[in-house]
């Protein structure tokens, strides 16, 4: 076989070996982002924060006063 016929095979082997060599490093770089994504699953989103977080902003009492006021109005 002539050497010129082996050049495409040689280039394909270089590409395959380079890809296989860099794949573990690519997967290792994905681990921190996957961990942070898993940690964010249990956290509340910003959109629901203002509705869920009444106790922290001390709005529970205001909500109760509003509910009492609405009850008084509905009685009349």
From Swiss-Prot:
<dbReference type="GO" id="GO:0044218">
    <property type="term" value="C:other organism cell membrane"/>
</dbReference>
<keyword id="KW-1053">Target membrane</keyword>
<dbReference type="GO" id="GO:0031640">
    <property type="term" value="P:killing of cells of another organism"/>
</dbReference>
<feature type="signal peptide">
    <location>
        <begin position="1"/>
        <end position="22"/>
    </location>
</feature>
<keyword id="KW-0165">Cleavage on pair of basic residues</keyword>
<dbReference type="GO" id="GO:0050832">
    <property type="term" value="P:defense response to fungus"/>
</dbReference>
<protein>
    <recommendedName>
        <fullName>VpAmp1.0</fullName>
    </recommendedName>
</protein>
<comment type="function">
    <text>Antimicrobial peptide with potent activity against Gram-positive bacteria S.aureus (MIC=2.5 uM) and S.agalactiaea (MIC=2.5 uM), and Gram-negative bacteria E.coli (MIC=24 uM) and P.aeruginosa (MIC=2.5 uM), as well as against yeasts Candida albicans (MIC=6.25 uM) and C.glabrata (MIC&gt;50 uM). Also elicits high hemolysis on human erythrocytes (HC(50)=9.2 uM).</text>
</comment>
<feature type="propeptide">
    <location>
        <begin position="42"/>
        <end position="76"/>
    </location>
</feature>
<keyword id="KW-0472">Membrane</keyword>
<dbReference type="GO" id="GO:0042742">
    <property type="term" value="P:defense response to bacterium"/>
</dbReference>
<keyword id="KW-0929">Antimicrobial</keyword>
<keyword id="KW-0295">Fungicide</keyword>
<keyword id="KW-0204">Cytolysis</keyword>
<keyword id="KW-1052">Target cell membrane</keyword>
<dbReference type="GO" id="GO:0005576">
    <property type="term" value="C:extracellular region"/>
</dbReference>
<keyword id="KW-0044">Antibiotic</keyword>
<keyword id="KW-0027">Amidation</keyword>
<dbReference type="GO" id="GO:0016020">
    <property type="term" value="C:membrane"/>
</dbReference>
<comment type="similarity">
    <text>Belongs to the non-disulfide-bridged peptide (NDBP) superfamily. Short antimicrobial peptide (group 4) family.</text>
</comment>
<keyword id="KW-0964">Secreted</keyword>
<keyword id="KW-0732">Signal</keyword>
<feature type="modified residue" description="Isoleucine amide">
    <location>
        <position position="41"/>
    </location>
</feature>
